[in-house]
C-alpha cells in the first residue's frame, strides 16, 4: 500500500513539472501569427517549430497551438501590444 501511495504521489509531481500550455503564437511585433492566406499545414508546422504538439488556424485568422513549452510566448488580452508600437 505504501508503494502505491508513493507511485501516485510521484505521478502527480511529474504532472505538475511537465505542464504545457496552449495558446496563440505571437511574433516579435506582439501580434498573433496570421494564417488567413497561408496553406492549411502552416500553423501545424509553426507549432512544431516551437516544440508544440499540434496546431491549427483558428477561424482562418490566427495560429492556435497545443502543448507548447512554457518558454514560448503566447498572446493574451492583458499583455496585448499588437499595433501599439514598440
From Swiss-Prot:
Residues 1-20 form the signal peptide. Residues 21-83 form the LCN-type CS-alpha/beta domain. Disulfide bonds join 31-82, 35-57, 43-63, 47-65. One of its GO terms (biological process) is defense response. Keywords: Amidation, Disulfide bond, Ion channel impairing toxin, Neurotoxin, Secreted, Signal, Toxin, Voltage-gated sodium channel impairing toxin. GO terms for molecular function: sodium channel inhibitor activity; toxin activity. Expressed by the venom gland. Belongs to the long (4 C-C) scorpion toxin superfamily. Sodium channel inhibitor family. Beta subfamily. This is Toxin To3.
Amino acid at each position: 500500500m505504501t508503494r502505491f501511495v508513493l507511485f501516485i504521489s510521484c505521478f502527480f509531481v511529474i504532472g505538475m513539472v511537465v505542464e504545457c500550455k496552449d495558446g496563440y503564437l505571437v511574433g516579435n511585433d506582439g501580434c498573433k501569427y496570421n494564417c488567413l492566406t497561408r496553406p492549411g499545414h502552416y500553423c501545424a508546422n509553426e507549432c512544431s517549430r516551437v516544440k508544440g504538439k499540434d496546431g491549427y488556424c483558428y477561424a482562418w485568422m490566427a495560429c492556435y497551438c497545443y502543448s507548447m513549452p512554457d518558454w514560448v510566448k503566447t498572446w493574451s488580452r492583458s499583455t496585448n501590444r499588437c499595433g501599439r508600437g514598440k
